[in-house]
Amino acid sequence: MAKDEKKAALEAALKKIEKNFGKGAVMRMGEKVDTQISTVPSGSLALDAALGVGGYPRGRIVEIYGPESSGKTTVALHAVAEVQKRGGTAAYIDAENAMDPAYAEALGVDIDQLILSQPNTGEEGLQIADTLISSGAIDIVVVDSVAALVPRAEIEGEMGDSHVGLQARLMSQALRKLSGTIAKTKTIAIFINQIREKVGVMFGNPETTPGGRALKFYSTIRLEVRRAEQIKQSTNVIGNRVKIKVVKNKVAPPFKVAEVDIMYGQGISQSGELLDMAADQDIVDKAGAWYSYHGEKIGQGRENAKKYLEEHPDVSEDIQTQVRKGLRNRC
């Protein structure tokens, strides 16, 4: 076949594919206009930096997992709040029936506009998620949690019945169907997951996540959330220092770690991570216990310096602008 004939045959094939499957079903990479990854901030400056692209990528699946009470739901709710701030629509599939509206509101979530579902079975929850995502009107959907997506057969069965691999098959089937729709509609899908321990593991990490391997494969980003230490004010515990490790990242280099303060009743402390990142970039000077900015002392000890930034939003905004500029220069 001559070169011109090949070219004509290819053009005819491309037109046929577009006619059958719609515009954009196939394209040359050089023709694709939107090569930049569109993202939504995570609500944490440190996590945005660790993710490498400034937030969660649209049209991708994100898994957030970790031990109990480590801050997984808090991290997900901050993402919901950020989407809503930008005029987006958010849905929350509360399979655990543990949603706290007052706490979500404290984190900046507009609960009046939040679409909430508390499904009875795993199939119901995933079908609701599929319907919402397929509509193209949802910007972010959070499933809390994968472990609570119990298959219908298990709910309708008797206690003690064996249902080996049932949940894994359910997740595998659902993700095969959802992944394409999520990419097409540019929806951010966040799956919160718990941790289980494998029985009889003598060597290596005994920890695993429920729901089989499908979610690990389909996820663009996997975040491991763990408590590092308690934050105390005098003798009272007022929050936790949390480490968020990017264990998988298909859009930037993985294995980066973000350390954030999650304060009880308030969520991620923006001032705490801003102070740490500003000190790391030498925007804020740290000498001993004292923090200073432009030669002026802003606090003795980290908590006092955080308080200063919270009470002086103009200074905080100025520092944040410089920190973001520094992060862009690093990239």
UniProtKB/Swiss-Prot annotation:
Subcellular location: Cytoplasm
GO annotation terms (biological process): DNA recombination; DNA repair; SOS response
Binding-site residues for ATP, renumbered to this chain: G66, P67, E68, S69, S70, G71, K72, T73
Keyword DNA repair appears in the UniProt entry: yes
Major location category of this protein: cytoplasm
Disulfide bonds: none
Keyword vocabulary terms for this entry: ATP-binding, Cytoplasm, DNA damage, DNA recombination, DNA repair, DNA-binding, Nucleotide-binding, SOS response
Molecular function in Gene Ontology: ATP binding; ATP hydrolysis activity; ATP-dependent DNA damage sensor activity; damaged DNA binding; single-stranded DNA binding
Claim: ATP-binding is one of the keywords in the record: yes
InterPro entries for this protein: AAA+_ATPase, DNA_recomb/repair_RecA, DNA_recomb/repair_RecA_CS, P-loop_NTPase, RecA-like_C, RecA-like_N, RecA_ATP-bd, RecA_C_sf
Any single GO CC term annotated in Swiss-Prot or TrEMBL for this entry: cytosol
HAMAP family xref list: RecA
Function of the molecule: Can catalyze the hydrolysis of ATP in the presence of single-stranded DNA, the ATP-dependent uptake of single-stranded DNA by duplex DNA, and the ATP-dependent hybridization of homologous single-stranded DNAs. It interacts with LexA causing its activation and leading to its autocatalytic cleavage.
Family: Belongs to the RecA family.
Protein name in the entry: Protein RecA
Gene that encodes it: recA
